[in-house]
Structures are given as C-alpha cells and as structure tokens.
C-alpha cells in the first residue's frame, strides 16, 4: 500500500516566516506549539522576541466516507506581537502589521495551492483572519488563522490487512441478527 501524500504545513509556514521581508523586518520568530495552551506558553518567549508566528503541530479533522473519500485536517497558525501595555494605538499598529503579514502569506499560499492540487490535496479557499481579544495577553496583540486541508484517502478494503475474516460474500456472526 502506498501512503497518501500529505502536506507539511509546519515546514511551509516556517519557510514563509524566514523568507518574508516584512516578517524579518518586524523580527517575527517561528515556533511550533501544541494547541492554544502551547501558544500561551510561547507568548512567554516574547521577552526575547518582538513577535512570533506559531503553528499548532496538532490538527483537528475528520474523514468523509463518500464516493471520493477524503480526510480533512485543520491547521492553526497564530501571530503575536508585543506592544506597550494599555497603548491601544500601538496595538492597532501591531494588528495592521499582522494583517499585512497574513496577506503576504496568503499570496504565497495561492501558489502552493496550485502545486498541492496536482497531488490531490485541496486547501479550503475560505481562510479567515481572527483577532484575539485585547485582554488575552497584556501588552501583546494576537491573532490566528486556520487552513483546512483535504487529502484523498484510499479506503479500498484489503483482506491482507485483516485476520480471521469470513469468506467474501458471507457475514460475520457479529453482524447477523434475526429481525422477525
């Protein structure tokens, strides 16, 4: 069985962070986190960094059992930038910067999307940028976006993956009941 091709979102967004001129100018540092709690822990590193791009190395998802079975995974990317506490103008400037970094990331994601579709990987075209409430972390503007990734999933039944199966065309006693 050949494994399904998968997209390495972590490596992709790390590369974007390292290559984007605005992200470099504003000193964004890339990091991997595990969930929102991991992002909160990463915010503690803002003592040594001015801004971060953090990707959640876990993903939410589901599998659809339809004519073209696929698996959907949702990857979350967080942004955070330090600013002076209680300075709403500075917070607004940070949000503007993060929105612009997001826009520039999306300009590269469009190109990546075309490449991925050639490998039967489909990105949801609706990617929302969400600002996190100003009281989430004092002195820090935060936002996130999520990318939904659909990949073809080979669900062909293979006898060699199972043991002690009945012959083809017969039912297992566990699945037969008298419905009279």
Regions found by a protein language model. Name each.
Residues 146-165:
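A hydrophobic membrane-anchoring alpha-helix module
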Residues 6, 17, 23, 95-152:
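Acidic-leaning, charged glycine-interspersed low-complexity segments
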Residues 1-11, 18, 66-72, 78-109:
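Extracellular/virion structural assembly segments
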Residues 28-92, 122-141, 155-159:
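Short, solvent-exposed beta-alpha or beta-beta edge segments that form flexible loop/patches at the rim
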Residues 1-67, 161-180:
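Small/polar-rich, solvent-exposed N-terminal microdomains that initiate assembly or binding
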